[in-house]
């Protein structure tokens, strides 16, 4: 193989118009790779540090020239000369160079940009698709999408406490058909909202954020939209929600407050019962962050209570970190992890988290961030790891659609071996639970 000869970073913009880091890697034999780093709006307390400039006179302090300088300076000096295929060694060298537990010195956005660009350069050098380079010849599972079609909580200005309401085409025979079903349901939902005089403008992730009266009204609209599109709720299209419970938790009172809707307050036990009531009433197959990210014992309790019949996803709870995931597995807390490459900061560490989850029987959902770009790496990553589920936004906005289009390309390339598991991608749930969802 050939050596890395040049690494170059620049400041570009993400889907929200905020600065982010783009990195290009070049090899001596003409290999080229480019990676663009996403960013989140709501971030976990323990995420790797996204280095921003802090200069209020430039991009309101959100510039990333410091991170860019770190790539073009110390990181480039360290990594130029490495074999481009030495991904693990390159990632570990950058982690060592940074020397902090949260990548706060060089910036996770600087390190990740290089990590992603190196992988693409290696794939280009070998003349193979990125998913094939990362996952080898066994990469063949196309993911069941989580499509965020209604936004609430911190992602909106309506009276809805939950952050995201998603549809999952669990009954589709292929990812191409899953995307079609999602698109048809999305447009049916838009038609219903418009007919009722509700706003149909879209948010950061392409979902609608009209004014609703409470947390159940969006669920009711989703049921109507699924049916209007010609599908059966549960059997064909299931529902997933992101509660983002840390946004609702009051650490002083030790209660969850529905701060955007009714103002009701719940003890942890009452809140779990509240969520269980929704699971029993609607075809909800997945709940993300149902408990505050720092309440480990409560996470174990809700998993014991609901973990056999609904996917319980740790996002802010695990932040794609193997240390937190290992603790969760030991405690029996959650049964799934959301995988965000910029939460941990390198491709190697991301892969380690996915592998650890799968070995423990946890599902791994590869995810976008609210501040996305045209980079489609996560589409290749989810196939490379056979993770089985992806969360990459709604059926609008090019930054989201780019990932769906890439999945359809990959499915075409894997003709004859591609597998779409749908409801069976929820291997963390009992067979009875999967059957029950289909019959709701």
UniProtKB/Swiss-Prot annotation:
Transmembrane segments: none annotated. It catalyses: (2R)-2-phosphoglycerate = phosphoenolpyruvate + H2O. Pathway: Carbohydrate degradation; glycolysis; pyruvate from D-glyceraldehyde 3-phosphate: step 4/5. Binds a second Mg(2+) ion via substrate during catalysis. (2R)-2-phosphoglycerate binds at residues 163, 340, 369-370, 391. Its EC number is 4.2.1.11. Its main location: cytoplasm. Mg(2+) binds at residues 242, 288, 315. InterPro entries: Enolase (IPR000941), Enolase-like_C_sf (IPR036849), Enolase-like_N (IPR029017), Enolase_C (IPR020810), Enolase_CS (IPR020809), Enolase_N (IPR020811). The keyword Ribosomal protein does not apply. It is an enzyme of class 4 (lyase). One of its GO terms (molecular function) is magnesium ion binding. NCBIfam families: eno (TIGR01060). This is Enolase. The lineage of its organism: Bacteria, Bacillati, Bacillota, Bacilli, Lactobacillales.
């Amino acid at each position: 193989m050939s050596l890395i000869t040049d690494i170059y970073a620049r400041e570009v913009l993400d889907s929200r118009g905020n600065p982010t880091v783009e990195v290009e890697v070049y090899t001596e034999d003409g290999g080229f790779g480019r990676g663009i780093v996403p960013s989140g709006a709501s971030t976990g307390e323990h995420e790797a540090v996204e280095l921003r400039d802090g200069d209020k006179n430039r991009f309101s302090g959100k510039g990333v020239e410091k991170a860019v300088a770190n790539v073009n300076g110390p990181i480039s000096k360290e990594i130029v000369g490495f074999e481009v295929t030495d991904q693990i060694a390159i990632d570990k060298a950058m982690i060592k160079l940074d020397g902090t537990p949260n990548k706060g010195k060089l910036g996770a956005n600087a390190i990740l940009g290089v990590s992603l660009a190196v992988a693409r350069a290696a794939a280009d050098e070998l003349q193979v698709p990125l998913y094939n380079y990362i996952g080898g010849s066994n990469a063949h599972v196309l993911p069941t999408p989580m499509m965020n079609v209604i936004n609430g909580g911190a992602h909106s200005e309506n009276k809805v406490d939950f952050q995201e309401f998603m549809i999952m085409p669990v009954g589709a025979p292929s990812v191409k058909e899953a995307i079609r079903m999602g698109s048809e349901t999305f447009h049916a939902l838009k038609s219903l909202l418009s007919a009722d005089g509700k706003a149909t403008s879209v948010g950061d992730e392409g979902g609608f954020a009209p004014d609703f009266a409470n947390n159940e009204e969006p669920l009711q609209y989703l049921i109507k939209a699924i049916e209007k599109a010609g599908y059966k709720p549960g059997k064909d299209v299931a529902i997933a929600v992101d509660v983002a419970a840390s946004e609702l938790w009051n650490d002083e009172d030790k209660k969850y407050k529905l701060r955007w809707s009714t103002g009701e307050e719940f003890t942890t036990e009452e809140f779990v019962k509240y969520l269980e009531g929704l699971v029993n009433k609607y075809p909800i197959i997945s709940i993300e962050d149902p408990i505050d990210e720092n309440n480990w014992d409560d996470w174990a309790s809700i998993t014991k209570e609901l973990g056999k019949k609904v996917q319980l996803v740790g996002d802010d709870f695990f932040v794609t970190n193997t240390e937190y995931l290992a603790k969760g597995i030991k405690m029996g807390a959650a049964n799934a992890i959301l995988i965000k490459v910029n939460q941990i900061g390198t491709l190697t560490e991301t892969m380690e988290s996915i592998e650890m989850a799968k070995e423990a029987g946890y599902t791994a959902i590869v995810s976008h961030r609210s501040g996305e770009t045209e980079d489609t790496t996560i589409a290749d990553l989810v196939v490379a790891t056979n993770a089985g589920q992806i969360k990459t936004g709604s059926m609008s906005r090019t930054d989201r659609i780019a990932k769906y289009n890439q999945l359809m390309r990959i499915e075409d390339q894997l003709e004859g071996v591609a597998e779409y598991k749908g409801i069976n991608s929820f291997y963390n749930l009992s067979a009875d639970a999967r059957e029950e969802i289909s019959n709701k």
